[in-house]
């Protein structure tokens, strides 16, 4: 059995979980999330805990067992605390500006790039070089952060571009000068 899958999930006070077959709805102070889970797993409530159990022992069932437990745990954490991902802009003249709910990136192109967040995601700009992506759905927050990073990935010669906060970018050495024929 999956080590992650067999751990029960504690439901904190103030969080309401509705289980209807394989459809689960989680309501909390930050919002509501719903998800349909695979038929290979069953989700049951036992007191203040949620327990995910596999239906069979084949490989497909085992592969969805731990995944389902983690997705359910992320739903509970999301409606209780939310998720956020921080991005940094590195480079001379590169910046981000807030324009209503949109963010305008000026990252070395001849044009500016405007990013509008989808429903449930908020973008905030701290200064001109830090962007924060927040929301209750961990998958959507990560996807939005990845899309913003893909606007201008950090280059490996100067390190300029948009990167995750704390991300290490390996800088390659430039061309060697003075080596070769005389």
UniProtKB/Swiss-Prot annotation:
Cystines in this chain: none
Gene3D superfamilies to which the protein is assigned, alphabetical: Ribosomal protein L6, alpha-beta domain
A GO cellular component annotation in the UniProt record: cytosolic large ribosomal subunit
Keywords annotated in UniProt: Ribonucleoprotein, Ribosomal protein, RNA-binding, rRNA-binding
Entry's Gene Ontology BP terms: cytoplasmic translation
One annotated GO molecular function: rRNA binding
Pfam families (alphabetical): Ribosomal_L6
InterPro entries: Ribosomal_uL6-like (IPR000702), Ribosomal_uL6-like_a/b-dom_sf (IPR036789), Ribosomal_uL6_a/b-dom (IPR020040), Ribosomal_uL6_bac-type (IPR019906)
Family: Belongs to the universal ribosomal protein uL6 family.
Function comment: This protein binds to the 23S rRNA, and is important in its secondary structure. It is located near the subunit interface in the base of the L7/L12 stalk, and near the tRNA binding site of the peptidyltransferase center.
Entry-linked PANTHER family: 60S/50S RIBOSOMAL PROTEIN L6/L9, LARGE RIBOSOMAL SUBUNIT PROTEIN UL6M
Summary of subunit composition and partner proteins: Part of the 50S ribosomal subunit.
UniProt protein name: Large ribosomal subunit protein uL6
Species for this entry: Dehalococcoides mccartyi (strain CBDB1)
Gene name for this UniProt entry: rplF
């Amino acid at each position: 059995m999956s080590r992650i899958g067999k751990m029960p999930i504690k439901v904190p006070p103030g969080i309401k979980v509705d289980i209807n077959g394989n459809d689960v709805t989680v309501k909390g102070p930050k919002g509501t999330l719903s998800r349909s889970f695979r038929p290979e797993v069953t989700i049951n409530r036992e007191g203040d805990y949620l327990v995910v159990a596999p239906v069979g022992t084949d490989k497909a069932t085992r592969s969805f067992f731990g995944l389902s437990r983690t997705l359910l745990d992320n739903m509970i954490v999301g409606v209780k605390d939310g998720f956020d991902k921080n991005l940094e802009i590195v480079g001379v003249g590169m910046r981000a500006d807030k324009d209503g709910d949109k963010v305008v990136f000026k990252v070395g192109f001849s044009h500016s790039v405007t990013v509008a967040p989808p429903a449930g995601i908020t973008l905030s700009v701290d200064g001109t070089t830090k962007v924060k992506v927040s929301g209750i759905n961990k998958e959507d927050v990560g996807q939005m952060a990845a899309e913003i990073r893909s606007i201008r990935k950090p280059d490996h010669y100067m390190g300029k571009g948009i990167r995750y906060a704390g991300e290490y970018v390996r800088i390659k050495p430039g061309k060697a000068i003075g080596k070769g024929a005389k």
